[in-house]
Amino acid sequence: MTGPTRETELAHLDRPKAPETTFAVVSDAHVTADAEGTWKVFHRTESRLEAVVDDVNRRDVDGLVFAGDLTKDGTSPEFDRVAEILSGLDAPYFAVPGNHDVPKTFDEHETPPLSTFVAAHCPDELPYRARLGGLDVVCLNSASDADGTLREGHAGRISDAQLDWMADAVDPETPTVAVFHHPTTHVGRLFERFPDTDHYQLQNADAVVEALDSANVELAISGHIHWPTAARVSGVSGESDSRPRNGPADSFDGVTQVTTPAACSFPQAYLLVRVTPEGTTVSLVPLGDDEARTEAYRYAAADSARDSAVAESTDDGYFDSFPLLDERAPKPTTSD
């Protein structure tokens, strides 16, 4: 097992460019006090979120963004525990909901309505725009919809109304990052070891990428798949370009999609995003020690085909291949 043991650069991006701004992105904490085991390592979820707070408090960050799934199942006690842990955070934070944070038809408990999540973790009604240092962050809801269709499962979709709102809300003169839970890319098509499961990717990925590109949003950050990726997205569903990995993005029209590793499951990490006038660096920050990392790896390896893919990809040297994207690398020389 070779997982990340220290802060590791996931991507060097040509854009966004902005006055120096640093923020953390955390996803899929799945906090619970009442469950153990599984590939999500439920009995460690509280301590992993506490580790996020401790680590971020030691850094000079402009803020922290949660990309969804703060809780295991969206129960009131789970939300209360999240709030208790986050009360120790020094930096400002805001969040978008994940599929486990919102009511589902199959819940065996009463999940608080979305308005409760918004009141606790958002500066305004969803969707909203927040300022972090020298850039704007547009936060969209991919986990629930007005007609209730997403209540039937774990799929994600960003409504047309939100995309229309974004078109008006984004300031074209201000570098902008978008955050939503379900990604536009499909991990099963980026990496063959992962199964081709429908709910891994936004149902309307094409429309979302087109809207992001039209609004001049150059970077989208999501969670949901519990695995760190970085890819250039063209707007054709499933056609995401993470190869070639290195080289300038001068001729690339589209959006860069980054997915955030889970705080709960292997590799138990979060992202640190540093934006400068020269470009953006996205780094993976591990949360646990060697013992914690080994435990999470063993749970992943022993679980379903999807999670054994995590272990197999790690064994194949996935983390040794970082950065996955390096858009600021010099162009390769060619011989005449």
Regions found by a protein language model. Give the residues of each.
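A short C-terminal boundary segment appended to hydrolase-like catalytic domains
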Residues: 3-8, 18-19, 277-336
